[in-house]
From Swiss-Prot:
Transmembrane segments: 24-46
Organism encoding this protein: Chlorella vulgaris
Cysteine disulfide links: none
Keywords: ATP synthesis, ATP-binding, CF(0), Chloroplast, Hydrogen ion transport, Ion transport, Membrane, Nucleotide-binding, Plastid, Thylakoid, Transmembrane, Transmembrane helix, Transport
Molecular function terms from GO: ATP binding; proton-transporting ATP synthase activity, rotational mechanism
Location relative to the cell: Plastid, Chloroplast thylakoid membrane
Function: F(1)F(0) ATP synthase produces ATP from ADP in the presence of a proton or sodium gradient. F-type ATPases consist of two structural domains, F(1) containing the extramembraneous catalytic core and F(0) containing the membrane proton channel, linked together by a central stalk and a peripheral stalk. During catalysis, ATP synthesis in the catalytic domain of F(1) is coupled via a rotary mechanism of the central stalk subunits to proton translocation. Component of the F(0) channel, it forms part of the peripheral stalk, linking F(1) to F(0).
Other notes: In plastids the F-type ATPase is also known as CF(1)CF(0).
Family: Belongs to the ATPase B chain family.
Gene Ontology cellular-component terms listed: chloroplast thylakoid membrane; proton-transporting ATP synthase complex
Protein name according to UniProt: ATP synthase subunit b, chloroplastic
HAMAP family assigned: ATP_synth_b_bprime
Keyword Magnesium among record annotations: no
Membrane topology: Single-pass membrane protein
Amino acid sequence: MLLSTSFLLAGHFGFNTNLLETNVLNLAVVLAIVLTYVGDALRGLLANRKQSILTNFREADQRATEAQNKLREAQLELEQAQAKAQKIREQANVTIEQEKKQFIRQTQEDIKRLGTLQQETLKFEQQKAQNELAEKLVKLALQQVREKLNQRLTSSIHSAVNNFQIVLFTNSKAS
């Protein structure tokens, strides 16, 4: 108390005329009282806030851990799906190759069968043409024989031939 001017009244009691020091002391006393009572409440609020923040951090960590786990699971499922898709593609390629080979083999068999059928058809047509030619030759020969027979055939020879044919016909019917 540098500039302290006090007047002593009645020996023990003093009156302090320095207002600044008194105000500072009064302010310190008020602050001590306020901090004592309000400080407990403020410490409680700060402790609650601290606990709330810690709880939020724990929950955030837990959610982050769960998100990481879900991400790992999703990545694992993606890898499995990609592996399955690759396997399906490989199986499809194998199936395509097998179908291709089967188609080529079937086509070759069809070509061979068509070649055989063509050969058989040609043989059949050739035989048919030969048979028609043979039939025409036989008809022509028979016609020429008839003409010669008709020219040289007398009625007695004609009767003998007819009788002979009748006997052959009856013999063939009897047997």
